[in-house]
Amino acid sequence: MADVCVVHLVWAPLGPAALQRFVASYRARPAGAEHRLIVVWKGFGDPGPGADHLAALDGIAHEALHYDLPTLDLPAYGWCAETLDAGALCFLNSESTVLADGWLAALLEPLRDPGVGATGATGSYESPRSIIPFRRRRWPAFPNPHLRTNAFAVSRDLMRELRWPTVRTKPAAWELESGRDGFTRQVWGRGLQTLVVGRDGRPYAPAEWHRSATFRSGAQANLLVADNRTRQWDEADADLRARLSRMAWGADPEAAAAQAPSGGSGGPTRASGA
């Protein structure tokens, strides 16, 4: 039995097209590492996925799980970590498509370093924090480095250690991804690094993310796994691209990178609320 599970979440409201896009990319791009593909049917209820969904997986070796709790993706991933028997897990959301041969091997390789807790295809400095006091307590100020959880890899043991509360709204999901006690900050709190991995196979520390050409920069030419947000940037006009890039990296990305906490080695290098 392979010690790595690739977990692809299939969300019922998206219909079969998203799964068909993922499967086409999965067939075309060898993962580069032995694994088991786990398809999580989310929100299908009884009687489960229809013929078009099932047909998309014809000829693809996979195992199926069913998740029908009314939560967003991250609690479902936490449930998968409890359910599956594997040493490492790679999670790909419903909108994901893989873009390069060896994509899984690239995400897994940095995890061989005991100082690395998680890798992802993209990261951002964005913070939704505002002047509202309650929100200020929930999110660090910009720059707020965090892995985007559209595509990420982590050991099962670490995944099971982390807190995965039941979240049912987009703001709560953003907080679990990028908030003060979100995924990245929980990993940092254990003294571990979070790295973005590019199509070039190179891992990038948070201070390098804006130069990695993976998310809303550098024509995204080094992107390993695409999703709806990377496609949004690809398809945007120049004005919208500029706005989206500022949201991710600020008006001066180099200055933001110099101020950004980096995690690992005991956690952030500056106070998260500074």
What do these predicted regions represent?
Residues 97-181, 185:
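Conserved catalytic core of nucleotide-sugar-dependent glycosyltransferases
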Residues 45-84:
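Active-site-proximal specificity loops/subdomain of glycosyltransferases
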Residues 4-18, 40:
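A conserved hydrophobic helix/loop-capping motif in glycosyltransferases and polysaccharide synthases
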Residues 15-18, 44-52, 128-129:
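Short, charged/polar "capping" segments at the starts of alpha-helices
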Residues 169-274:
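C-terminal catalytic/acceptor-binding lobe
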Residues 2-5, 29-39, 62-63:
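Short loop->beta transition adjacent to catalytic acidic/histidine clusters or analogous donor-positioning motifs
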Residues 13-30:
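Short, well-formed alpha-helical segments that are part of the catalytic scaffolds
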Residues 86-97:
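Short beta-strand-to-loop acidic/aromatic patch adjacent to the donor-nucleotide binding site
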